[in-house]
A protein has these predicted regions:
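Short S/T/G/P-rich N-terminal loop/turn motif that feeds into the first structured element of a domain
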Residues: 17-247
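Bacterial Sec-dependent N-terminal signal peptides
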Residues: 1-20
């Protein structure tokens, strides 16, 4: 995940929001290892050079899409405008990767903006276990929702030691119903996540209250609850696959 961080930071040096797209891929039964191998070869061949789009690949571990692939692309608007469906890159994918996709099942093409001010990036290694929290908030709740995210970032940055894994925030810009945001937390493993929840999360809450007043975390969290739509909160776990991702 470190290279993901470096690429995103390069984008966000010039502007606060970077454009991402995601899609969900269903792999044929028994072909996951082959899909990962061939998707990795394609990605290493075409998506590591300057001026090329970058891709990151995850396996979905929980939820209705468990067992599928979640693939993220980062590209500038110029890259998207000049995308050629007849390019060598696309032909390589169709010839070498598509045969392992079930019935051409590539779904859920969503566009996201990377929300740099609401993300906390640390120089981490081996943080390949990801928890993604997905929120849908009301128009009237936008300020309360993002104030809380901003304060969480400030509290994390003030912690000593800082959390080992990064926290990335993205906002859906196309394809979603309503105001959708996703927060991705990086860990080394399930055990590392449990350890964070038991040891680091209470320290983060303590720092939050130290910065913003007694019980501020609980009060702001309550405002977020009211800011969300009905059933506007979800949780998905992912496994980052570095061998099928840009370096």
């Amino acid at each position: 995940m470190k290279k993901f961080l470096l690429f995103i930071l390069t984008f966000t040096f010039s502007f606060s929001y970077s454009q991402l797209s995601t899609r969900t891929i269903e792999v044929k039964d028994g072909q996951m290892s082959k899909f990962i191998e061939m998707a990795g070869k394609k990605t290493k061949k075409f998506n590591n050079e300057d001026g090329a789009a970058r891709f990151w690949t995850y396996e979905i571990l929980t939820g209705s899409d468990a067992g599928k692939i979640w693939r993220m692309q980062a590209a500038t608007p110029e890259m998207r405008d000049n995308w050629d469906m007849n390019s060598e890159e696309v032909e390589y994918w169709q010839k070498n990767v598509s045969p392992y996709i079930a019935n051409g099942s590539v779904n859920g093409n969503y566009m996201w903006n990377y929300a740099g001010p609401y993300s906390h990036n640390v120089d981490s290694e081996n943080q390949n276990h990801v928890m993604m929290l997905v929120y849908t908030y009301k128009d009237s709740g936008e300020q309360d929702f993002w104030r809380f995210r901003e304060r969480v970032v400030a509290a994390r940055k003030a912690m000593e030691p800082a959390p080992k894994g990064s926290m990335h925030s993205v906002v859906c810009s196309s394809g979603c119903n309503g105001n959708v945001a996703a927060i991705l937390f990086e860990y080394e493993s399930w055990a590392d996540q449990q350890n964070y929840n038991q040891e680091m999360l209470p320290k983060m809450i303590e720092k939050y209250n130290e910065l913003y007043g007694n019980n501020a975390y609980e009060q702001d969290g309550s405002k977020v609850d009211k800011a969300l739509t009905e059933n506007g909160r979800g949780r998905i776990h992912l496994r980052f696959i570095p061998e099928a991702s840009s370096d």
